[in-house]
């Protein structure tokens, strides 16, 4: 029975159709937004990478083991994780609880908990197919933004000899360079990175220096207006307060935009309602299937389709080259018809050029 299901899944994957409006995009016209689904597919052995809920639960467990959180607080946060819908608020409160009472976020025990949770990430990469697909898009000019704390993409990219660079919103100069397309292999972590927890913020107030900076906001919002965002492995990104502050609620006329979101279709009614709702934000929702196991293969096939697109510049270069070669061939034939040895003519020309100056 299991083999039959796997065969069915594979056949579904082979027959899957992609939106022409998506696969005909030039890679450099896309901005890839990667969420926890990508990390979960790449390193399934790390529970904290599977979802926001799993990440918070893992941090609470680490805090308990390291004895940096009162047992009463441990119990309270576990209850909140189970009951509260807004996990970002829970995570924010958890960081505050492990930070100085002055409200300053550094130093804090949250950093130690994250280091415990994400220890030796490079050893846990089991299924790199999604990362390889993302890198193939980056090679061709696709920009990448993530809500994840981990740097699995950067680790894998460096293993492939790519000059990967992790960026966060605290560094204005780098953000501007990235947004203007000057850091080809840069990955912007809008929540920060676990290796630098001092730069991690979970609510818009922590980024007031960014959101109140007209220059930074203009270049970021311009990306949302001019690029097609492709959300991959993102379940809660549109509810993310940071993402909302930077893009979703700050860019007008969103229905005129064309973005894409790849999701799991667990329930048909919910999926089609979600699809209709997202069109109001200019986002086309598509499904990779009803099973998470289909996700890596879907991303691989999608990236392959997009990477097949030839850039207009490349086509112009090719046509010019072909025309140039054709002209040279015509000239060569005419010379040969007149009994002139082409190789000698070329050598004579080379000699003249060498001494001409």
UniProtKB/Swiss-Prot annotation:
Keywords recorded for this protein, A-Z: Acetylation, Membrane, Phosphoprotein, Transmembrane, Transmembrane helix
Main subcellular location of this protein, as a coarse class: membrane
Segments crossing the lipid bilayer: 30-46
Modified positions (Phosphoserine) in chain numbering: 311
GO terms for cellular component: membrane
Gene Ontology MF terms in the entry: identical protein binding
Source domain of life: Eukaryota
Pfam family, one: SIR2_2
InterPro entries, per the entry: FAM118
Modified residues (N-acetylmethionine): 1
Localisation per UniProt entry: Membrane
Membrane topology: Single-pass membrane protein
Family label: Belongs to the FAM118 family.
Protein name: Protein FAM118A
Gene: Fam118a
């Amino acid at each position: 029975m299991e083999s039959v299901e796997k065969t069915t899944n594979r056949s579904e994957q082979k027959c899957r159709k992609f939106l022409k409006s998506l696969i005909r995009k030039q890679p450099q016209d896309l901005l890839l937004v990667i969420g926890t689904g990508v990390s979960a597919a790449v390193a399934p052995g790390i529970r904290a990478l599977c979802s926001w809920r799993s990440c918070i639960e893992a941090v609470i467990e680490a805090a308990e083991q390291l004895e940096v959180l009162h047992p009463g607080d441990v119990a309270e946060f576990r209850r909140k994780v189970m009951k509260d819908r807004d996990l970002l608020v829970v995570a924010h409160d958890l960081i505050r609880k492990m930070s100085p009472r002055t409200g300053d976020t550094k130093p804090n025990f949250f950093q130690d908990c994250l280091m415990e949770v994400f220890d030796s990430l490079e050893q846990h990469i089991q299924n790199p197919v999604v990362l390889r697909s993302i890198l193939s898009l980056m090679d061709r000019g696709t920009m990448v933004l993530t809500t994840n704390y981990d740097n699995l993409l950067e680790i894998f990219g460096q293993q492939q000899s790519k000059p990967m660079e992790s960026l966060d919103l605290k560094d204005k100069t780098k953000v501007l360079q990235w947004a203007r397309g000057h850091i080809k292999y840069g990955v912007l972590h809008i929540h920060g990175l676990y290796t630098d927890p001092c730069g991690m913020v979970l609510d818009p107030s922590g980024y007031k220096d960014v959101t109140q900076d007209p220059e930074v906001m203009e270049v970021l919002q311009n990306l949302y207006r001019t690029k097609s965002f492709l959300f991959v492995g993102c379940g809660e990104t549109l509810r993310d307060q940071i993402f909302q502050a930077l893009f979703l609620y700050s860019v007008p006329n969103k229905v005129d935009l064309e973005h894409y979101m790849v999701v799991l279709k667990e329930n048909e009614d919910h999926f089609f309602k979600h699809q209709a709702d997202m069109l109001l934000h200019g986002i086309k929702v598509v499904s990779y299937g009803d099973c998470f196991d289909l996700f890596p293969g879907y991303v691989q096939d999608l990236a392959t389709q997009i990477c097949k697109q030839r850039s207009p510049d490349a086509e112009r270069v090719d046509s010019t080259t072909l025309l140039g070669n054709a002209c040279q061939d015509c000239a060569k034939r005419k010379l040969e018809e007149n009994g002139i040895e082409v190789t000698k003519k070329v050598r004579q020309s080379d000699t003249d050029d060498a001494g001409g100056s």
